[in-house]
């Protein structure tokens, strides 16, 4: 073969997509076009080869994910097998000849007895259909369900490990991809097992069609005697069934091995795993040897056979037991050296100990970081808080907040605590409580006006204010249907918890942006904006970048538009070194987003304004120091100003269209700091953050 031919073959081998497309087209043509017996023999041999190779792959892979394409392969092989059955059926009925392999298989299995051949075929088919396929199908179904149910918990666990520094960003990304791939694979396997099941049913139908059709054609068209026709076509039919069912059985075994495989960190091939785990229990082998010896003593049983087996199993168990004992003794000796306090290995350890424990390993307290986000719930609420529903709600909240703010919030740890008050829950950040509430058993939380509940005749109990300026009422679950019909908003216990948590996360969002998170966000952008990332890191240090993001998120400004934020850092970073002022310039670069957010997509922005005199008063109270600037108004002026704000704005919860407060850029951050304790939900904007298209709707002017 010349080099040009080899190069051509290499090119074909590289284009696996074309090879698959050609194979699928060939499968379709096999169903339509008649094939000569020689070609059928080749295709049947190929079918068997594929089945054997797939079985070997299933045995030698370390994890099911290493063969994640198996569901698709299962579909292709099933189609190929069915197309082959159609081709052989056509040749059996038309020419009474389906190739040498089919005839040999049939003649060998039938062995001169049609009934025996059919019984053997049925046994193989039933074993495949009822035993292997049915079991594999159930395992795949349960694995798919459990994998999907466990996904939120696994995701939160990965986030928690990443926050705690146990794993880095790349490893977290790999683990998430593995979880997603695992869920998709078992979900696909759940459906793909139906192919194997259907293939077994099709095989049963085809054998009866071939026998009946063959005998009918042989008697009516070919002039054969009924017995002769039955003998001829039964051999061919059973042979056809066997050449189809044997590869199908191998494929079913392959599927069973893959879906029942339990993978772990130290997994190797299936044979090694089984061998390791079997020889790890020498006592079981010793007991098994004794039982085999007892079987050999039963009258009528083949004594010699059972004695030989008992000897082999018993000796194997004894040898493994001796080996295990020697290993245990060696480990104990090593442990005694390590913990002796005077041995050399202990002196070389890095563990720092003191007092009586000096030189002993395992006595030092392990380093443990605080949990970033923790919810303690009264243990009596464990049944009321459905795990799956709560997981779904928590994942939904984290996803929604990420889409709104762009903050990668950590995993949420839920702990049921027996030492809490009835129905009480506490939300903690870094294990410090920041919010608490109460869940009332048998009740739903309703956030509607009293008049609406009274109008519907629904009794209620006043609940505590979960959030400032938001009343809540408890309504018995027996009125749930009436609330639904009246389209009133209500919350289950899981929804109450996640709703309260979402507000807490929004309020403390800046606490979840640190240097590690900033680095993570930059890494996410590096693929598409490499030059921008390089330039911004040259101009703005990572610590300053982190502080800017914290200030933006702290005022409910999303950092998802990282490109615009980084572009603004590059533009203003060299001109302005003060982080606070640099943040103001970046906010002005985000004015289109800010206007859209607070105008609710309209061109009209309801706003309160500060009088010029008030702005000058605040401006004169700003003090500059080496540590930064701050507002130092006299207490009387501060109280007077806050009183005017209260009079002008009033109760924010009673205002339908949420307003903003607009002031000059140089005092905006000081005004925000001044009013946030009482009006946290009132955004403070500067005139530079307004687009030309926005129209201000003045609601009032605040004067002294």
From Swiss-Prot:
Could be involved in the secretion of the yop virulence proteins. It holds the Pfam family FHIPEP. The keyword Metal-binding does not apply. This is Low calcium response locus protein D. It is found in: Cell inner membrane. GO terms for biological process: protein secretion. GO terms for cellular component: plasma membrane. Its main location: membrane. It comes from the Bacteria. Belongs to the FHIPEP (flagella/HR/invasion proteins export pore) family. Keywords: Cell inner membrane, Cell membrane, Membrane, Plasmid, Protein transport, Transmembrane, Transmembrane helix, Transport, Virulence. The keyword Signal does not apply. The chain crosses the membrane at residues 18-35, 42-61, 108-132, 200-220, 235-259, 278-297, 304-320. It is a multi-pass membrane protein. InterPro entries: FHIPEP_1, FHIPEP_3, FHIPEP_4, FHIPEP_CS, T3SS_FHIPEP, T3SS_HrcV.
């Amino acid at each position: 073969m010349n080099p040009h031919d080899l190069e051509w073959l290499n090119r074909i081998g590289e284009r696996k997509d074309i090879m698959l497309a050609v194979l699928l087209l060939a499968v379709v043509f096999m169903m339509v076009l008649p094939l000569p017996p020689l070609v059928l023999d080749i295709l049947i041999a190929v079918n068997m080869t594929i089945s054997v190779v797939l079985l070997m792959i299933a045995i030698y892979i370390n994890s099911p994910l290493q063969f994640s394409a198996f569901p698709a392969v299962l579909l292709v092989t099933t189609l190929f097998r069915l197309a082959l059955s159609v081709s052989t059926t056509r040749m059996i009925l038309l020419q009474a000849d389906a190739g040498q392999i089919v005839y040999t298989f049939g003649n060998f299995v039938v062995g001169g007895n049609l009934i025996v051949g059919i019984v053997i075929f049925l046994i193989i088919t039933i074993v495949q259909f009822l035993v292997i396929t049915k079991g594999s199908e159930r395992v795949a179904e349960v694995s798919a369900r459990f994998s999907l149910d466990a996904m939120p918990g696994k995701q939160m666990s990965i986030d928690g490990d990443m926050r705690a520094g146990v794993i880095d960003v790349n490893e977290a990304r790999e683990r998430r991809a593995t979880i997603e791939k695992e869920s998709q694979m078992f979900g696909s396997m759940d459906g793909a097992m139906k192919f194997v099941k259907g293939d077994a049913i099709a095989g049963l139908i085809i054998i009866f069609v071939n026998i009946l059709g063959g005998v009918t054609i042989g008697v009516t068209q070919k002039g054969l005697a009924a017995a002769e026709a039955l003998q001829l076509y039964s051999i061919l039919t059973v042979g056809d069934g066997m050449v189809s069912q044997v590869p199908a059985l191998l494929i079913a075994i392959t599927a069973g091995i893959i879906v029942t495989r339990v993978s772990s960190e130290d997994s190797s091939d299936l044979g090694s795993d089984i061998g390791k785990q079997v020889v790890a229990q020498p006592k079981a082998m010793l007991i098994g040897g004794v039982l085999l010896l007892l079987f050999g003593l039963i009258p009528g049983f083949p004594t010699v056979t059972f004695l030989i087996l008992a000897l082999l199993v018993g000796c194997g168990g004894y040898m493994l037991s001796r080996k295990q004992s020697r290993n245990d003794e060696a480990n104990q000796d090593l442990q005694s050296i390590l913990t002796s306090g005077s041995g050399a290995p202990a002196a070389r350890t890095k563990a720092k100990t003191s007092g009586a424990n000096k030189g002993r390993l395992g006595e030092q307290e392990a380093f443990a970081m605080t949990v970033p986000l923790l919810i303690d719930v009264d243990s009596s609420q464990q049944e009321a808080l459905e795990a799956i529903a709560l997981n779904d709600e928590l994942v939904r909240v984290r996803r929604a907040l990420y889409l709104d703010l762009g903050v990668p919030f950590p995993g949420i740890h839920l702990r049921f605590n027996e030492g809490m008050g009835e129905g009480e829950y506490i939300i903690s950040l870094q294990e410090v409580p920041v919010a608490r509430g109460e869940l009332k058993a048998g009740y739903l939380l309703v956030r509607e006006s009293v008049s609406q509940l009274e109008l519907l005749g629904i009794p209620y109990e006043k609940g505590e204010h979960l959030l400032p300026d938001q009343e809540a009422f408890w309504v018995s679950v027996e009125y749930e249907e009436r609330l639904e019909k009246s389209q009133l908003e209500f919350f289950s216990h899981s929804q109450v918890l996640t709703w309260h948590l979402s507000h807490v996360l929004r309020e403390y969002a800046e606490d979840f942006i640190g240097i590690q998170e900033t680095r993570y966000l930059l890494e996410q952008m590096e693929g598409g904006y490499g030059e921008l990332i390089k330039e911004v890191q040259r101009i703005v240090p990572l610590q300053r970048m982190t502080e800017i993001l914290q200030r933006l998120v702290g005022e409910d400004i999303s950092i998802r538009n990282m490109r615009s934020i980084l572009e603004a850092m590059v533009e203003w970073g060299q001109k302005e070194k003060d982080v606070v002022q640099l943040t103001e310039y970046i906010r002005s670069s985000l004015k289109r987003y800010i206007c859209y957010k607070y105008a609710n997509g309209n061109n009209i922005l309801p706003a309160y304004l500060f009088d010029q005199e008030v702005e000058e008063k605040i401006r004169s109270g700003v003090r500059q120091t080496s540590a930064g600037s701050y507002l130092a108004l006299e207490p009387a002026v501060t109280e007077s100003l806050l009183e005017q704000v209260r009079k002008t704005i009033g109760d924010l919860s009673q205002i339908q269209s949420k307003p903003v407060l607009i002031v000059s850029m140089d005092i905006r951050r000081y005004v925000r700091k001044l009013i946030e304790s009482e009006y946290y939900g009132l955004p403070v904007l500067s005139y530079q953050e307004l687009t030309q298209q926005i129209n201000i709707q003045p609601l009032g002017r605040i004067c002294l």
